[in-house]
């Protein structure tokens, strides 16, 4: 499985060749030719010879799956990736994403952005709890369509990831409004929050908590959150002075200027 350290030799060679292909264009520091790479007079003929500085530059150019493979090559590469990696997307993983997160979260503790979008729900609470336990610098998290998650995930994020500025839990239908209220009280730096389709989560009670705690909020998606009314939206208006956009598509209880029977993307003046 991707992320394990027991790679075959051909896997390492393939990884090396791919890294060298991408690394060949980096600021003249590398010269490709005759199967060798030179850097500051040093010949690099094998994956073990790549200096850590060069490795980090190259890993910034390749896809996330290759980055994970690279972290399993040897201890030196693992340490370099763990210290240098701040953004990771696992949306390409269509099977076993939950186990992959459980494996990677303890290693990639410097992550600031983590994208875990799914077409078929895979993530479970234990994976999110692992993220919260190890990735305390996380600022951007996408958990959209994580149908299997429960309130336990939001409680864990509240305690482990207080620096979140952007959170996407659209389509996570199992979360309750009390769990979102709890999250808002800890994650007070939130600027972008996507609650589209979170019918149980987005209520006037939850919006009141967001207005009370998340004063830096700028963008909020409440699409198809049918329990939201004027009361909740007004609490946002009073409590979030930086608020710029609110998506109220399908919010049938909204009246007056904000018509809920049609898609409404409200621009705050």
Where is each model-derived feature located?
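Conserved hydrophobic beta-strand positions in leucine-rich repeat
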Residues: 88-90, 114-117, 141-143, 167-169, ...
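Short hydrophobic alpha-helical "box" of cullin-RING ligase substrate receptors
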Residues: 50-62, 76-77
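F-box-proximal linker/hinge
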Residues: 74, 89-138
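Short helix-loop-helix/strand-helix junction enriched in hydrophobic and basic residues
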Residues: 67-83
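A structural signal for leucine-rich repeat
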Residues: 102-106, 128-134, 154-160, 180-186, ...
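CRL adaptor-proximal regions
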Residues: 1-49
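Short, solvent-exposed loop/turn at the beta-strand->alpha-helix junction
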Residues: 94-100, 120-126, 147-152, 173-178, ...
């Amino acid at each position: 499985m991707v992320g394990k350290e027991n790679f075959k030799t051909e896997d390492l060679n393939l990884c090396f060749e791919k890294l060298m292909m991408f690394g060949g264009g980096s600021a003249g520091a590398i010269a490709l030719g005759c199967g060798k790479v030179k850097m500051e007079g040093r010949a690099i003929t094998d994956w073990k010879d790549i200096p850590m500085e060069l490795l980090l530059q190259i890993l910034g150019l390749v896809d996330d799956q290759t980055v994970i493979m690279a972290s399993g090559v040897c201890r030196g590469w693992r340490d370099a990736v763990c210290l240098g990696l701040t953004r990771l997307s696992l949306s390409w993983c269509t099977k076993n994403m939950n186990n992959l997160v459980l494996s990677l979260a303890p290693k990639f503790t410097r992550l600031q952005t983590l994208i875990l979008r799914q077409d078929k729900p895979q993530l479970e609470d234990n994976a999110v709890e692992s993220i919260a336990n190890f990735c305390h610098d996380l600022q951007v998290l996408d958990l959209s369509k994580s149908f299997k998650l429960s309130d336990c995930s939001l409680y864990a994020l509240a305690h482990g990831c207080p620096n979140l500025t952007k959170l996407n839990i659209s389509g996570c239908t199992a979360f309750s409004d009390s769990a979102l209220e709890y999250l808002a009280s800890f994650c007070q730096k939130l600027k972008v929050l996507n609650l589209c389709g979170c019918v149980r989560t987005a209520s006037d009670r939850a919006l009141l908590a967001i207005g009370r705690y998340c004063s830096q909020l700028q963008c909020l998606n409440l699409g198809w959150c049918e329990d939201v009314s004027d009361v909740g939206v007004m609490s946002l208006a009073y409590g979030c002075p930086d608020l710029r956009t609110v998506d109220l598509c399908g919010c049938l209880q909204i009246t007056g200027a904000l018509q809920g029977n049609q898609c409404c993307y409200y621009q705050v003046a």
